[in-house]
């Protein structure tokens, strides 16, 4: 087992950049309000939500939501697009899928395991 791990971690140079992005994304999601906001945007799909609709849905102050959306945006998990006088926030599904792929890519050292295949399939 240790030899397999040493072999895996011996070529860390290209992974370091990926790891820093993963750590940044997980850190952004490691706060209850941000996690709820991200999940709400995932549910909203490609239509996205305005900050006011998202704040009402989550029952949090718009100023607090703004802080959380900035953190999620900085981590690349959400994007904002101007639509008239409003901003529309959307989950970045490609980033989310990259994160899930990174977390599960070497599951069980390539052997079959108890991971449910549907749980690791990409979304959207």
Model-identified regions with their sequence ranges:
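Amphipathic alpha-helical dimerization/coiled-coil segments
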Residues: 1-21, 42-43, 93-124
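Conserved catalytic-core motifs of GNAT/GCN5-like acyltransferases
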Residues: 81-83, 113
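Alpha-helical residues within the helix-turn-helix
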Residues: 56, 73-74
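N-terminal helix-turn-helix DNA-binding core of bacterial DNA-binding proteins
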Residues: 16-61, 83-95
């Amino acid at each position: 087992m240790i030899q397999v791990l040493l072999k895996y971690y011996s070529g860390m140079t290209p992974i370091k950049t990926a790891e820093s992005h993963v750590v940044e994304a997980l850190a952004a999601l490691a706060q209850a309000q941000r996690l709820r906001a991200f999940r709400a945007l995932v549910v909203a799909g490609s239509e996205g939500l305005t900050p006011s609709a998202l704040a009402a849905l989550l029952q949090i102050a718009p100023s607090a939501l703004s802080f959380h959306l900035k953190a999620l945006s900085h981590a690349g998990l959400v994007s904002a697009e101007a639509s008239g006088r409003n901003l529309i926030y959307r989950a970045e599904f490609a980033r989310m899928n990259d994160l899930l792929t990174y977390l599960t890519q070497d599951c069980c050292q390539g052997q079959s395991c108890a991971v449910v295949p549907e749980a690791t399939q990409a979304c959207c």
